[in-house]
């Protein structure tokens, strides 16, 4: 996060819903014994690019000023093809819309113009253990219209609450 906060001073500002792209290289600590990027590293790159979006947009001041905490609510990652050590890849972050509580993003992991993995997340903003209404933040940014998430994105997370409730009822 420190790197992102320093770099924000040298990068152009982006809109809160703008698609951004960052090129990375698969390093040796990203890999498993087969020298391909381990599944655990994909969420790290997804977090990085979401933080970059916050740092480079007006969301940074809206969130930091209020001492809010952006937090991941749920994610799904589809791995299609492996990425080998030392190879370059791009992470593309696209906004998939929002509702009154959640912000949805789609992350594409591209290499040689081919999608190697896709990560879909929903996140929210917390203050003192209470999810904060995004409406206030959007008003502060001057946003009058927001994009609703597509049905396929909503459907991915539809059963989340029920899954957690059932997990809490299980016998240990």
Which residue ranges define each predicted feature?
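HotDog/MaoC-like acyl-thioester-processing domains
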Residues: 1-9, 79, 83-88, 94-172
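Generic structural detector for well-ordered beta-strands
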Residues: 23-27, 78, 124
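Residue-level preference for alpha-helix termini and adjacent loops
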Residues: 30, 36, 62, 76-78, ...
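Short, basic/aromatic beta-hairpin or loop at an interaction surface
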Residues: 61-70
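Short beta-strand/loop turn elements enriched in aromatics
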Residues: 48-62
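Short, structured beta-strand/loop micro-motifs enriched in basic residues and often containing a Trp
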Residues: 71-75
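Catalytic strand-loop segment that frames the active site of acyl-thioester-processing enzymes
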Residues: 1-52, 157-172
């Amino acid at each position: 996060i420190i790197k992102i906060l320093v770099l924000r001073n040298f990068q152009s500002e982006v809109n809160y819903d703008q698609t951004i792209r960052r090129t990375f290289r698969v390093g040796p600590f990203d890999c498993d014994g087969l020298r391909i990027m381990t599944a655990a590293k994909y969420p790290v790159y997804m977090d990085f690019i979401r933080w970059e979006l916050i740092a480079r947009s007006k969301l940074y001041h809206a969130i930091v000023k209020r001492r809010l905490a952006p937090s991941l609510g749920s994610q799904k990652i589809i791995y299609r093809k492996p990425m080998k050590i030392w190879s370059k890849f791009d992470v593309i972050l696209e906004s998939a819309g929002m509702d009154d509580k959640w912000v949805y993003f789609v992350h594409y992991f591209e290499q040689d113009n081919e999608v190697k993995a896709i990560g879909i997340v929903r996140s929210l903003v917390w203050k003192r253990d209470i999810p904060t209404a995004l409406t206030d933040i959007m008003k502060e940014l001057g946003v009058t219209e927001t994009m609703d998430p597509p049905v396929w994105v909503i459907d991915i997370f539809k059963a989340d609450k029920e899954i957690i409730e059932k997990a809490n009822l299980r016998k240990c």
